[in-house]
Amino acid sequence: MFVRKKKHRSGNIGVIVAEKICGKMKELVTIGVAYNEGEVDNLVNEAKEWISKEKSRRHPQLDLFGEEREACDRERDEVRRVLSNVSNILLNGCDLILDRTFDRIGFNRIDDEVFRKLVKARLAYPTSKAATVEYLKNHFDEDVDLSKIYRYLDKLSGHQHEIVQDISVRHTAKLFGGNIGVLFYDVTTLYFEADYEDELRKTGFSKEGRHSNPQIILGLLVSLGGYPLAYCIHEGNKYEGHTMLPTINEFVSKYGLENFVVVADSGLMNNANIAELEAHGYKYIIGAKIKNESQEVKSWILEQPKRNCQMVEYDKGGGRRLLVGYTDDRAKKDAYNREKGIRRLEKAYKHGALTKGNINKRGYNKFLSMDGEVKVAINYGRIADDSKWDGLKGYLTNTDIPIQDVYTAYHNLWHVERAFRIAKSKIEIRPMFHFTRKRIEAHICICFVALKVYKELDRMLKVSEIKMSVDKVLALAKTITTIQIKLPLNKEVYTQTMLMARHQKIAKLFDEDFWVTQ
């Protein structure tokens, strides 16, 4: 016995059960007539069930496991019926996790679905805006027109910047019991794949070695733990030391901050900046350029015994304290780097590649000097003097906090450095291909929110003791599907996220109660 589909002149399809007897086909029963493909599948399943029952009727003595076989057939038919009503399959594991993190921070205050999608895409699939459109379509069945995205970027920068910073600050303050006690500030450079400059994109000193590419300077203010608070964008050729004070002044004024400490690297500071910090009444901990101190201070530093992990203090007057620490590890690193630089100089000297143009203070060129009117020589006396400073690191502060706390606070600057690494390697904030100021600012705004979402998800993983990185969680989530089944009678759509055995490590992230209780 077999199932036969017979097409009528009207275009309808009859489903029949037939069998061959002595080489001739005989129709046993007509199951029904189908008017569309969906009905055909249902009638075919009914026909198979009829055949199973007919075989049991004809050969009861052979059907020792008839009831079990019949139950299995019904089970298969039920599965086929369910699968025939699947209306969509979404690869949306990342989407579900990022949505909940986005909302938990409070970014759902921004009633803007395009903004939400661009932030999530930046975390799940960081790429160009054109490729983002394809990603949204293929993974979430969401149609977003590319021209609409570009028009959206043109209007985004004007009104979202302040809102997203406000949401981020309020959420971070909540994590710290309402008080943001330490502000860490640093800058990086972001280059463009372009050959020309404009009023914003300028060539300048590149932290990425892209000195011929136009760039912008991005300043970032973060809290303890590396949670982003505020950002600023400046021309690519601006002195980075001039970017910090305006950002901090605006931030403090807006949020009425009191009793806080500013922590920054020595590269951002000069005497004018330090004086301005003090004029505003700010407390600070900054890296000190101990080799630029007065001869009296330098002599005092070099006279101090060098003990591993020990710090000494020098009172500079006016409330300023100079703290100097020494570690064996830093001493080894300083010596190694210097020796490597000297070997390069000696190699260049041997081949006659050193000229007057090399006499500058860049890197290890500081060890070069003129031998007579023309000849360039390596000054080994300077090298010997430089070695005296191996292992020493200075910190300048106007706080009265203990020495060890100053050291700990300063070395938490790695949170800013890590934030930049996340932005560049995970969120892929650069290189940028936008060329208008509005779109550049919009792109940075989206990346800032993506960084905040990344950091909050990282915190949630630690709180919930999920021993996986954000990157690994998102990679695993990309293998999670959600099926949508359209119920044939009431036309409702039933949705089910499919978590397999390998997904159990992160299963709690898909539990609504988890996001409420944490």
Language-model features: locations:
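Conserved glycine(s) in the ABC-transporter nucleotide-binding domain "signature"
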Residues: 1-113
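Anion-binding and metal-coordination hotspots
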Residues: 2-4, 12-13, 24-25, 98-518
